C-alpha cells in the first residue's frame, strides 16, 4: 500500500502495508488496524514486524518494535547475494540471485523493501504463488537466512575457501 521511510539512528524503517480489519461481535463490528514493517541497518541486518492496534500509529509502532526485536544477520557479498537462494512461506515462493554492479534491485513490492533495508544493492528476484505482503516478506527473510557465505561453508566442511569455490 504505502511506503513510509524513516531513519532512527543507524536503522532504516519501512512501512510495507497498513490494513483495516474487523471483528464482528453481537453489537456490530470492532475495527482495528494491522501494520507490516521492515527494519534494517543497510549493512546485512534485517527484521520484520507485524503489529495490530485500534489506531494506525499504535499498530505501526508495535510493528516497528517487533521488527527491531526479530533481526537476523545476512552475509552479503559487496552489496549483492552470495549465491542464488529460494525461500518459501505458506503459498509464497521467492527466488533471488546475485547481480552485477549497476543492476539495482529488481524486485517487486514487499520483497524490494526487505532487500533495500538489508543493504542489498544489486539483485535479480521473482516472487511466485501468493503475493500477500506478509508471506512474501517471510519468504524473503527465509531465503536470506538460508544464504551461507563461502567462508561459513568452508569452515563447516573443514576445507579452504579455494576448495569450495573450485
UniProtKB/Swiss-Prot annotation:
What are the recorded Gene Ontology BP terms? translation
> Which Pfam families does its entry note?
Ribosomal_S5, Ribosomal_S5_C
Q: Which SUPFAM superfamilies match?
A: dsRNA-binding domain-like, Ribosomal protein S5 domain 2-like
Any one GO MF annotation of this record:
rRNA binding
One cellular component term (GO) for this entry is: small ribosomal subunit
Keywords for this protein: Ribonucleoprotein, Ribosomal protein, RNA-binding, rRNA-binding
Q: Which first-to-last residue range defines the signal peptide?
A: none
Matching entries from InterPro entries are given as: Ribosomal_Su5_D2-typ_SF (IPR020568), Ribosomal_uS5 (IPR000851), Ribosomal_uS5_bac-type (IPR005712), Ribosomal_uS5_C (IPR005324), Ribosomal_uS5_N (IPR013810), Ribosomal_uS5_N_CS (IPR018192), Ribsml_uS5_D2-typ_fold_subgr (IPR014721)
Question: Which residue ranges does the record assign to the S5 DRBM domain?
Answer: 11-74
- Could you give the subunit structure recorded for this chain? Part of the 30S ribosomal subunit. Contacts proteins S4 and S8.
Spell out the family assignment given in the record's similarity comment. Answer: Belongs to the universal ribosomal protein uS5 family.
Written domain comment of the UniProt record: The N-terminal domain interacts with the head of the 30S subunit; the C-terminal domain interacts with the body and contacts protein S4. The interaction surface between S4 and S5 is involved in control of translational fidelity.
Q: What does this protein do?
A: With S4 and S12 plays an important role in translational accuracy.
Show the PANTHER family listed in the entry: MITOCHONDRIAL RIBOSOMAL PROTEIN S5 (PTHR48277:SF1)
Protein name as annotated: Small ribosomal subunit protein uS5
- Give the organism, scientific name: Actinobacillus succinogenes (strain ATCC 55618 / DSM 22257 / CCUG 43843 / 130Z)
Question: Gene name?
Answer: rpsE
